[in-house]
């Protein structure tokens, strides 16, 4: 976990800082140190030195792979974004690795899908566009409406994965559009949780 300035949904000129867990731990240790009288230091000064620049109208690339289905007219997307702040393991490269792992398991198992399975590693999720609260959707939106307009009307579902390696809770969340709510509830109810999936 880190102090993260992502998705500020504001102007590109707004000052924003991110702090790693390692830096937080160092600052906390300094705050817990005691002076010669045995008292904690009441105040700690920290200097932020940030030089950031948002360069607009740059190119990003979505990476796509397919397993052809017997019904070539319909597709199921497995998607995750690969752009990130700092290392990006949790947000969201773990999800990219996961969808690649899903497809690899299907191929190794000889599975022949009915619907074409499309793997999408998307860019422009963290900051796809300035001055809007929908900056996170730019890469996915442009994939369907600009890069692959022929997909419209053929994608029956997009299973998008975000933060799959989160280890600080005893439950996951599934979100969907209201049209899929009944289906998703029945799907979730049918899933059996393996033992030890949420370690203490």
Where are these regions (language model features)?
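Soluble metallo-hydrolase cores and metallopeptidase-like ectodomains found primarily
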Residues: 5-90, 101-111
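Phosphate/oxyanion-binding active-site loops and adjacent basic polyanion-contact surfaces
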Residues: 56-58, 95, 136
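Extended, hydrophobic alpha-helical segments in both membrane/secreted and soluble proteins
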Residues: 76-78, 82, 90-106, 115-126, ...
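Active/binding-pocket-proximal capping segment
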Residues: 84, 117, 176-180
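Short helix-capping segments at alpha-helix termini
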Residues: 110-112, 150-151
């Amino acid at each position: 976990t880190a102090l993260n300035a992502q998705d500020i949904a504001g102007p590109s000129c707004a000052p924003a800082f991110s702090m790693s867990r390692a830096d937080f731990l160092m600052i906390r240790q300094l705050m817990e140190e005691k002076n010669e009288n045995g008292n904690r230091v009441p105040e700690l000064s920290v200097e932020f030195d940030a030089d950031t620049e948002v360069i607009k109208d740059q190119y990003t690339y979505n990476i796509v792979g397919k397993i052809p289905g017997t019904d070539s007219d319909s597709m199921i997307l497995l998607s995750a974004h690969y752009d990130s702040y700092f290392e990006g393991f949790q947000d969201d490269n773990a999800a990219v690795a996961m969808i690649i792992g899903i497809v690899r398991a299907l191929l190794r198992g000889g599975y022949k899908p009915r619907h074409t399975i499309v793997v999408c590693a998307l860019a422009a999720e963290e900051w796809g566009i300035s001055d809007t609260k929908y900056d996170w959707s730019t890469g996915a939106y442009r994939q369907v409406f600009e890069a692959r307009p022929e997909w419209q009307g053929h994608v029956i579902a997009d299973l998008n994965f975000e933060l799959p390696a989160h280890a600080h809770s005893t439950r996951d969340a599934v979100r969907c559009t209201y049209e899929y709510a009944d289906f998703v509830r029945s799907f979730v109810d049918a899933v059996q949780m393996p033992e030890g999936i949420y370690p203490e």
